[in-house]
Amino acid sequence: MNLQHHFLIAMPALQDPIFRRSVVYICEHNTNGAMGIIVNKPLENLKIEGILEKLKITPEPRDESIRLDKPVMLGGPLAEDRGFILHTPPSNFASSIRISDNTVMTTSRDVLETLGTDKQPSDVLVALGYASWEKGQLEQEILDNAWLTAPADLNILFKTPIADRWREAAKLIGVDILTMPGVAGHA
């Protein structure tokens, strides 16, 4: 089972404060473990424009049609001071990993310098921090009914309102997550 470019969808019974009702986009999954970014937990009072200001990045030339007031996500409980930018191609930045044909993760400053300009990738999600699972840990959590999985959908990742992403991700596999019981069994 390789869940790269998939969503993890928290089951209703998962009550961990960080992962409760979360949607995690899996960026890497292999025999050593998994790494992902939570895509539906906005950080309070932190927008992309705020990150650019803190880093003293001024978009030039500024394209006013590109909104920089989008929230920054809490990507996960690890390295919360590090930025992870999920975006559509191109992937010609200093530190980019192509996750799928249509999704790239970049951790270098050069992608931030394109935000708000005509060089910005068409779709962007900025997160601080990430989530990680050791070898076999994620698979066990799935067996323990902590997570549903679904192939990633770029519309949900980049365009669906943040508050709707949990429910919409579950709908990808025909589940109305809001009507699920708090505890699930095994069939």
UniProtKB/Swiss-Prot annotation:
Lineage: Bacteria, Pseudomonadati, Pseudomonadota, Gammaproteobacteria, Enterobacterales
Listed Pfam families: DUF179
The organism of origin for this protein: Escherichia coli O1:K1 / APEC
Domain of life the protein comes from: Bacteria
Sequence similarity: Belongs to the UPF0301 (AlgH) family.
Protein name listed in UniProt: UPF0301 protein YqgE
Annotated HAMAP family: UPF0301
Gene name in the database record: yqgE
GO CC field: cytosol
